[in-house]
Amino acid sequence: KLCAIWIYLDVLFSTASIMHLCAISLDRYVAIQNPIHHSRFNSRTKAFLKIIAVWTISVGISMPVPVFGLQDDSKVFKEGSCLLADDNFVLIGSFVAFFIPLTIMVITYFLTIKSLQKEATLCVSDPGTRAKLSSFSFLPQSSLSSEKLFQRSIHRETGSYAGRRTMQSISNEQKACKVLGIVFFLFVVMWCPFFVTNIMAVICKESCNEDVIGALLNVFVWIGYLSSAVNPLVYTLFNKTYRSAFA
């Protein structure tokens, strides 16, 4: 019984960690594509609802574990250790909890970068904006924040203050994208070995050495766990706001 609970919590928290990254990727893309809507309806309540949605999906994905684990111990207990032994769940769970979110993250991240580059080009090519940005050319110009996109969609700001705000937002957005890019890269590097090996354990049962596969899974799963521990370090290392918050 304890094995079913242990594996359920393991799958739940790992899936929730992955789904949160996927939600962040989607949220950033929506903020860039539709800044007016996102800025108007972005609130603590909306953020809370997004978090609830992530946890609901995570619970839904992991719930089969206690359902079949409490009924049949052989599906969660093998050779004296707690081990998920249901091949169907391993395959389906790996795709739903990792490969599908990974695909969404990769696509939305590159679409976000593309949109930011496009908006930055439009911002710099605008004659009025170009004049205001000339004295701030030392700042990166490859991205644009959703906040400034929202303001540009409503009205044109004038004066050097607006220029500073625009370029500061561009710089902040670029830094944010870099941090997210690093987080996503570490996510892939640290979780991909486990899920690939997890699928191999099911597909090549006859030809693969079970002891080797089992040993690899034990190592790779801990590397995956470290992914969540590394994220706060990445945020604090590359973002002053997070450094101040954790100080």
Curated annotation (Swiss-Prot):
Topology of this chain in the membrane: Multi-pass membrane protein
Residues spanned by motif DRY motif: 27-29
Regulation: G-protein coupled receptor activity is regulated by lipids: oleamide increases HTR2A-mediated activity.
Pfam family, one: 7tm_1
Entry GO MF terms: G protein-coupled serotonin receptor activity; neurotransmitter receptor activity
Keywords: Behavior, Cell membrane, Cell projection, Cytoplasmic vesicle, Disulfide bond, G-protein coupled receptor, Membrane, Phosphoprotein, Receptor, Synapse, Transducer, Transmembrane, Transmembrane helix
Modified residues (Phosphoserine): 135
Tissue: Detected in adult intestine, especially in mucosal epithelium, longitudinal and circular layers of muscularis externa and myenteric plexuses. Highly expressed in Paneth cells, and detected at lower levels in enterocytes (at protein level).
Cysteine pairs bridged by disulfides in the record: 3-82, 204-208
One of the GO BP terms on file: chemical synaptic transmission
Annotated motif NPxxY motif, positions: 231-235
Chain positions of site Hydrophobic barrier that decreases the speed of ligand binding and dissociation: 84
Transmembrane segments: 2-26, 47-70, 88-113, 178-203, 212-237
Residues binding serotonin, per UniProt: 10, 198
GO cellular component annotations of the record: axon; caveola; cytoplasmic vesicle; dendrite; presynapse
Cytoplasmic side of membrane: 27-46, 114-177, 238-247
Protein origin, superkingdom: Eukaryota
Extracellular compartment residues: 1, 71-87, 204-211
Subcellular locations according to the entry: Cell membrane; Cell projection, Dendrite; Cell projection, Axon; Cytoplasmic vesicle
Assembly: Interacts (via C-terminus) with MPDZ and PATJ. May interact (via C-terminus) with MPP3, PRDX6, DLG4, DLG1, CASK, APBA1 and MAGI2. Interacts with GRM2 and DRD2; this may affect signaling.
Function: G-protein coupled receptor for 5-hydroxytryptamine (serotonin). Also functions as a receptor for various drugs and psychoactive substances, including mescaline, psilocybin, 1-(2,5-dimethoxy-4-iodophenyl)-2-aminopropane (DOI) and lysergic acid diethylamide (LSD). Ligand binding causes a conformation change that triggers signaling via guanine nucleotide-binding proteins (G proteins) and modulates the activity of downstream effectors.
Entry domain remark: The PDZ domain-binding motif is involved in the interaction with PATJ, CASK, APBA1, DLG1 and DLG4.
Protein family (similarity comment): Belongs to the G-protein coupled receptor 1 family.
Protein name: 5-hydroxytryptamine receptor 2A
Organism the protein comes from: Cavia porcellus
